[in-house]
């Protein structure tokens, strides 16, 4: 069986116009996949040079396959049908290592055609590293490497204003573009680079903050033999992802034309502020996950897919989204409903086995950030507590007993909560405290909730009633009236 390379698999090759920091699965099934579609359907005509930003030889370089690899996109499409689509990606030309090919790295700045910089160096990547110097070959942090590359560009083209870059980080931190820009400016000042360079950074370059959304499941280790048999070639960089994707970029309106999105519309939004889209994702996608997990798991289910195929649990989650979460969010209702519909479709994806226990990690913090804001907003708007979000809190407290049908399961959270719950549930079993007292102790933890939730009218009583119902009747019976 042949391995992918451009000699045996000839096809389009594009001029290098994009630098990408990061060789991982996510960027390859997200950014490079989108660039490949735009190259095929428009005159974007842009090839990617992947820069490996860390010192590692694993996985091997994409250049071993001349930049070629296959994405397999699978899940439920807009009509709810299971689809699996294999695509040979030709947008990546080569990969270079900033550690072993530093001069080649700097030379990227000399190419007049270079226009875009994408990155995903993990959440820890956009951070300051004390001691990074201009002359390091290379510096340790990604922002320092980028500063050096930008200065190379500035110097080579004598500060030409038409030679700046559009920089689009994909790291999962709030306002990632602003954070990256601040660090680049910090290094420029720390390294005493000329004032003209700092002005050029501001005038000629755009740092765009983003929200990225796609579950990328990466190399399909268990299915490789079968998939390669179907493809007819060997691919060491096979990359799998779900059907859904969303790319929200906070940047100039002209970006849509530069990326040729006007000629081939992808699910890419160019917006003035990513905040409402971030809130939408956290509240609907992450919030639904967090509400679902303790309810579904204690109802005897193990994966998100099983939960969505269970009529009662599915109804509970959908009613929580449409009746309690969406009404308090600040975007047009039709946009929110369309996003919610995509989310429930993603939860049903038959190709992804998402274990409920793995999503349950750090459930207390997730409830505070993902559900509590909507619970409180609903109470404020209507004068009554949203029934399902409140029930989800009771289910979460019950989940920390660590026992289902007489069998224990691992609960993962910070040590404080694990010890606290162990103590509280032990006292509850020994009848030292009642259910309402247990709930009041949990909700009074100001340092965690950032407020005293026992002051929210009716909350302690409602959560205690729900918790008693779960303990006395079991999850199935307790949740049924809300389905």
Swiss-Prot record:
GO CC, alphabetical: cytosol
Entry EC no(s): 1.1.1.58
Biological process terms in GO annotation: D-galacturonate catabolic process; mannitol catabolic process
Broad enzyme group: oxidoreductase
InterPro entries: 6-PGluconate_DH-like_C_sf, 6PGD_dom2, Altronate_OxRdtase, Mannitol_DH_C, Mannitol_DH_N, NAD(P)-bd_dom_sf
Binding site for NAD(+): 18-29
Keyword NAD: yes
Record-linked Pfam families: Mannitol_dh, Mannitol_dh_C
GO molecular function terms attached to this record: mannitol-1-phosphate 5-dehydrogenase activity; tagaturonate reductase activity
Protein name: Altronate oxidoreductase
Lineage: Bacteria, Pseudomonadati, Pseudomonadota, Gammaproteobacteria, Enterobacterales
Catalytic activity field: D-altronate + NAD(+) = keto-D-tagaturonate + NADH + H(+)
Superkingdom classification of source: Bacteria
Recorded metabolic or biological pathway in which this protein acts: Carbohydrate metabolism; pentose and glucuronate interconversion
Record keywords: NAD, Oxidoreductase
Keyword Cell membrane: no
Annotated gene: uxaB
Protein family membership: Belongs to the mannitol dehydrogenase family. UxaB subfamily.
């Amino acid at each position: 069986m042949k391995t992918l390379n451009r000699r045996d698999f000839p096809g389009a090759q594009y001029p290098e116009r994009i630098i990408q920091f990061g060789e991982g699965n996510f960027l390859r099934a997200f950014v490079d996949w989108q660039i490949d579609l735009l190259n095929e359907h428009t005159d974007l005509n842009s090839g990617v040079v992947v820069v490996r930003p860390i010192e590692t030889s694993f996985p091997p370089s994409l250049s071993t396959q001349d930049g070629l690899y296959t994405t397999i996109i699978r899940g439920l499409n807009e009509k709810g049908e299971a689809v699996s689509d294999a695509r040979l990606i030709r947008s990546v030309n080569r990969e270079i290592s900033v550690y072993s090919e530093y001069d080649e790295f700097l030379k990227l700045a000399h190419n007049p055609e270079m226009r875009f910089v994408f990155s995903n160096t993990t959440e820890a990547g956009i951070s300051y590293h004390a001691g990074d110097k201009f002359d390091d070959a290379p510096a340790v942090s990604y922002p320092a490497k980028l500063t050096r590359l930008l200065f190379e560009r500035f110097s080579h083209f004598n500060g030409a204003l038409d030679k700046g870059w559009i920089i689009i980080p994909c790291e999962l931190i709030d306002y990632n573009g602003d954070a990256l820009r601040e660090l680049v400016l910090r290094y420029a000042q720390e390294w005493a680079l000329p004032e003209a360079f700092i002005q050029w950074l501001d005038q000629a370059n755009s740092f765009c903050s983003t929200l990225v959304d796609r579950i990328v499941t990466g190399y399909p280790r268990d299915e490789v033999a079968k998939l390669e048999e179907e493809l007819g070639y060997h691919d060491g960089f096979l990359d799998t992802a779900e059907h859904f994707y969303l790319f929200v970029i906070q940047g100039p309106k002209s970006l849509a034309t530069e990326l040729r999105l006007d000629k081939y519309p992808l699910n890419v939004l160019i917006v003035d502020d990513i905040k409402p889209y971030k809130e939408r994702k956290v509240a609907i996608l992450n919030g639904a996950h967090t509400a679902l997990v303790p309810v579904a798991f204690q109802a005897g289910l193990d994966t998100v897919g099983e939960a969505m195929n269970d009529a009662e649990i599915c109804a509970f989650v959908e009613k929580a989204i449409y009746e309690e979460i969406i009404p308090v969010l600040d975007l047009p209702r039709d946009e929110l409903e369309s996003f919610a519909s995509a989310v429930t479709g993603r939860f049903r994806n038959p190709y992804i086995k998402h274990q409920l226990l793995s999503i349950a990690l750090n459930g207390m913090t997730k409830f505070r950030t993902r559900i509590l804001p909507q619970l409180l907003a609903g109470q404020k708007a209507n004068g009554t507590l949203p029934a399902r979000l409140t029930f989800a809190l009771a289910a979460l407290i019950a989940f920390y007993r660590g026992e289902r049908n007489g069998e224990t399961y691992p609960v993962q959270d910070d040590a404080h909560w694990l010890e606290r719950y162990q103590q509280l549930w032990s006292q509850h079993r020994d009848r030292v405290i009642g259910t309402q007292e247990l709930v009041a102790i949990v909700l009074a933890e100001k340092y965690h909730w950032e407020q005293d939730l026992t002051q929210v009218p009716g909350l302690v009583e409602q959560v205690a009633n729900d918790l008693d119902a779960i303990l006395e009747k079991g999850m199935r019976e307790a949740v049924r009236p809300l389905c």
